[in-house]
């Protein structure tokens, strides 16, 4: 709403916020049904592959259902043909075989996701950087996607 903020202070001075019909664009996505507002995610948590929208949280939630996965983060990477491709970075639980687990996780995900949602590549990490509140810092993970 117009009461959210007056504007931004930048190196150029004071700038008005970019609004749509007087409302600030937060990047949140949701829907309005039966006088209730549902927030479903954020615009940057969605990628477009071959014209279809993919919610990265769907991939993460599917991976976290696997008994050997401790943490998971799905990211989108630009692709010349598809537009964007989903990638998955996982931390496996201790005492589990990473090479065995990565193959099993691929099978596990193919059974639970639409074919278009299956990650192009699964990357193993020893840990995922987090904020003080425990949220995964996805910006720090993009370097792992570089070939």
Label each residue range with its predicted role.
Residues 14-15:
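Short secondary-structure edge/capping micro-motifs at helix/strand boundaries
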Residues 111-135:
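AMP-binding/adenylate-forming catalytic domain of the ANL superfamily
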Residues 1, 6-7, 22, 27-117, ...:
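AMP-binding/adenylate-forming catalytic core of the ANL superfamily
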Residues 10, 19-20, 79, 131:
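Acidic surface patches and DE-rich sequence motifs
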